[in-house]
Regions:
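Short, basic/aromatic recognition patches that contact phosphate-bearing ligands
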Residues: 1-96
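Bulky hydrophobic/aromatic content
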Residues: 86-156
Length: 156
């Protein structure tokens, strides 16, 4: 037991932490070098070294998570290159949610927070937009959101 604690409390979850790290911290304009990756994993209770991380990156690639290595001078930076949604697509969805009259302000904020989780923390700030539509009042009825879903289910 003591040996496992020395190695790190979350070693078995290393690939999950790596995938989360790349999803939350990297994008086309933001990458991490090996030292940053090792430090961020250590903060999560995961010990790692360069050699095993290279193998882990390949495991992620084999699973379909596109990790790119980019040379920056003497350093190599790593980043996630492909996501389920592109940033412009998410901006469109955010604008649609904000402008939808039948979605409450609270539910709009919840949905937008979920959409923000699909991009890096850097790109998430670009999704914090405010769509202004004159004379558009958002509903106060929280059940409308679920009623629309129920109607759709009934139609199908």
């Amino acid at each position: 037991m003591a040996g496992n604690e020395r190695r790190g409390d979350h070693q078995k979850q290393k690939l999950l932490y790596l995938a989360k790290l790349f999803t939350e911290e990297t994008d086309a304009q933001h990458a991490l070098d090996m030292a940053e990756i090792i430090d961020k994993l250590a903060a999560c209770g995961v010990n790692a070294d360069r050699k095993t991380l290279y193998l882990d990156f390949q495991e992620l690639r084999d699973f379909g998570i596109e990790i790119e290595a980019v040379k920056a001078g003497r350093n190599t930076l790593y980043r996630l290159t492909s996501r389920r949604f592109e940033l412009p697509e998410l901006k469109l969805l955010v604008d649609s949610v904000q402008s939808a009259k039948f979605i409450t302000d609270k539910k709009s904020k919840e949905l937008i927070a979920k959409l923000e989780s699909l991009v890096s923390r850097h790109e998430a700030t670009q999704l914090q937009r405010q769509v202004i539509i004159s004379d558009r009042i958002k509903t106060m009825n929280t059940s409308v959101y679920y009623n629309v879903d129920a109607i759709h289910e009934a139609i199908n």
